[in-house]
């Protein structure tokens, strides 16, 4: 009997083991040794959202049904909460240990426009709860083939110069208020009828939440699902270890304010593969904030491979926060089409740090609006409504955190169409951009091949070919 049970147990584990083994194929022929991810495993328990009172009619609020389903699984040690076919209106969802949120193919989770549902009671924070969160959890996942929609147009400001007349009219028909001589629209006093949660549109805008934010978690999986229309960032693991992003789609309007797609903030051991991004801000982004006690710091051991990025401010982005360091990042075999920039390294005084062992190879790009490759050391965050011409000032403490882009190796890049091929500018008197090599790269149909400030940067170009449509200036 014991032998039979062992055989059955092994058979039940086989698919997970096989899937885990599949991830090893991505780690072949790496230019640097890095820790590999392992797929989280979950108990075989399953709860269907309908069985705990859920109604997928697009009208009924299912916040309590999600809570009941997760609580029921938690008491059993974890398992899968299945969201079946339907449109499931809900407030915030909080995942627990060993919980897999699974969306069937025709399932849409649609987050309520009622902002009151997201306010953290008794909190003095200027932020609200993410649409989906997990905090200090082990083994959490969002999987399946459905859609998760953050209803972001109820939260995001809109700049007039980023929309057509028809789109601007549509926003005004939702309600809202125009500011700054009609150049900015805020979702304030909306016709949806739900009350605002702050006493001014500017204050409320600062409370925008992420669609998915996992903090201080271990063993995280995002697989198959479409994440769209976030109030702010879409998929945002922070201070997490062992994070897998496999085969997801992230999409939002091209003009979505702060509409980052996939942001790894201070994460260790991660994999982003087979995913597609079409976003309003950064595409595949690595961030590293200032060190915190009792928390993961820096971003390291991240493999990014076989992904496609359409619109984004940058397809692969490092920064702007790099303070705790960025180590052992490999980006390869990715496609960028129609992004503002291709490979974007951005940081600034007060948020900068050191990069180590970054390898980027076999990247193809087309129709890049600005730079194919850019190093920027004077980045300043400018929220909607701020003065774009304001000159920043820095304290001595902030000056300690200067960008240090180094030990970066880029090869086998082909780009057709960019305003500038390679742009790099450091900060005079600081060694911000150095020991970087770009090899075996072809950039054609540019207005300018390169714009490199030799006084502040040290780049080595080898076998790099440019071709311009217009005479270089």
Functional labels for PLM-detected ranges:
Residues 2-82, 87-100, 104-216, 221-223, ...:
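Extracellular "leader-to-stem" segments immediately downstream of a signal peptide or signal-anchor
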Residues 55-57, 290-295, 324-325, 351:
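Short, small-residue-enriched loops and turns at beta-alpha junctions
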Residues 78, 92, 112-113, 151-155, ...:
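Short glycine/acidic-rich loop motifs that flank beta-strands on beta-rich extracellular proteins
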Residues 83-91, 261-263, 292, 348-349, ...:
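Conserved short loop/turn motifs at secondary-structure junctions
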Residues 87, 239, 249, 288-290, ...:
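Active-site-proximal loop/turn and secondary-structure-junction residues that shape catalytic pockets
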Residues 105-106, 138-146, 218-228, 241-253, ...:
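Right-handed parallel beta-helix
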Residues 322, 342-473:
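Extracellular beta-rich repeat passengers
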């Amino acid at each position: 009997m014991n032998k039979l049970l062992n055989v059955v147990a092994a058979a039940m584990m086989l698919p997970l083991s096989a899937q885990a083994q599949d991830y090893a194929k991505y780690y072949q022929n790496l230019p640097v040794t890095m820790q590999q991810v392992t797929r989280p495993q979950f108990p075989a328990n399953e709860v269907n959202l309908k069985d705990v009172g859920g109604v997928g009619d697009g009208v009924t609020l299912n916040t309590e049904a999600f809570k009941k389903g997760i609580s029921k699984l938690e008491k059993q040690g974890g398992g899968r909460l299945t969201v079946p076919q339907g449109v499931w209106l809900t407030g915030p969802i909080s995942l627990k240990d060993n919980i897999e949120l699974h969306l069937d193919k025709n399932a849409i989770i649609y987050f309520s426009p009622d902002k009151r549902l997201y306010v953290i009671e008794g909190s003095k924070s200027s932020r609200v709860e993410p649409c989906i969160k997990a905090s200090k959890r082990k083994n959490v996942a969002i999987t399946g083939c459905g859609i998760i929609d953050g209803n972001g147009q109820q939260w995001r400001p809109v700049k007039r110069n980023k929309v057509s007349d028809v789109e601007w009219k549509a926003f005004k028909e939702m309600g809202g208020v125009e500011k700054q001589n009609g150049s900015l629209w805020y979702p304030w006093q909306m016709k949806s009828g739900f009350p605002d949660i702050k006493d001014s549109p500017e204050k409320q805008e600062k409370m925008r939440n992420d669609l998915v934010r996992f903090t201080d978690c271990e063993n995280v999986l995002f697989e198959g699902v479409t994440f769209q229309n976030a109030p702010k960032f879409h998929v945002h693991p922070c201070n997490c270890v062992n994070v897998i992003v496999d085969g997801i789609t992230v999409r939002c309007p091209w003009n979505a304010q702060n509409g980052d797609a996939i942001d790894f903030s201070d994460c260790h051991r991660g994999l982003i593969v087979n995913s597609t991004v079409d976003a309003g801000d950064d595409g595949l982004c690595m961030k590293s904030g200032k060190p915190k006690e009792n928390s993961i710091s820096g971003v390291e051991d991240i493999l990014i491979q076989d992904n496609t990025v359409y619109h984004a401010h940058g397809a692969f982005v490092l920064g702007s926060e790099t303070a705790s360091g960025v180590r052992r990042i490999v980006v390869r075999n990715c496609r960028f089409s129609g992004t503002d920039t291709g490979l974007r390294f951005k940081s600034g005084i007060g948020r900068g740090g050191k990069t180590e062992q970054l390898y980027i190879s076999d990247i193809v790009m087309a129709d890049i609006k600005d730079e194919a490759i850019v190093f920027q050391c004077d980045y300043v965050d400018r929220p909607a409504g701020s003065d774009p011409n304001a000159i920043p000032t820095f304290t001595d403490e902030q000056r300690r955190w200067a960008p240090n882009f180094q030990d970066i190796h880029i090869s086998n890049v082909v780009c057709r169409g960019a305003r500038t091929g390679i742009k790099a500018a450091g900060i005079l008197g600081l060694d911000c951009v150095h020991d970087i090599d770009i090899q075996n790269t072809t950039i054609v149909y540019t207005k300018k091949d390169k714009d490199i400030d030799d006084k502040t940067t040290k780049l080595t170009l080898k076998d790099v070919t440019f071709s311009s449509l217009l005479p270089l200036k």
